[in-house]
Curated annotation (Swiss-Prot):
GO molecular function: small ribosomal subunit rRNA binding; structural constituent of ribosome
Alphabetical GO biological process terms: translation
Organism whose genome encodes this protein: Helicobacter acinonychis (strain Sheeba)
Name of the protein: Small ribosomal subunit protein bS18
Keywords on record: Ribonucleoprotein, Ribosomal protein, RNA-binding, rRNA-binding
Complex formation: Part of the 30S ribosomal subunit. Forms a tight heterodimer with protein bS6.
GO cellular component: cytosolic small ribosomal subunit
NCBIfam families: S18
Length: 85
């Protein structure tokens, strides 16, 4: 059985030379969240270990401040979680 290979992805934060991830900047955080607002793994986002840890902390802070929900009802899952209706 062959291993599943993922395409090479590059860290968007390193390329953009960002020095700080703000938990209030949801446009930046939405790239690492799934449609159910779960944190996606590094192999899918392409983030480096350093930036993945910083993004996780920012997402957890945003959840604590109620900017992002902790859980989503299965019936209310949308295509894009940040799309305004």
């Amino acid at each position: 059985m062959e291993k599943k290979r993922y395409s090479k992805r590059y860290c968007r934060y390193t390329e953009a030379k960002i020095s700080f991830i703000d938990y209030k900047d949801l446009d930046m955080l939405k790239h690492t969240l799934s449609e159910r607002y779960k944190i996606m793994p590094r192999r899918l986002t392409g983030n480096s270990k350093k930036w993945q840890e910083r993004v996780e902390v920012a997402i957890k802070r945003a959840r604590h401040m109620a900017l992002i929900p902790y859980i989503v009802d299965r019936k209310k899952v949308v295509d894009s979680p940040f799309k305004q209706h």
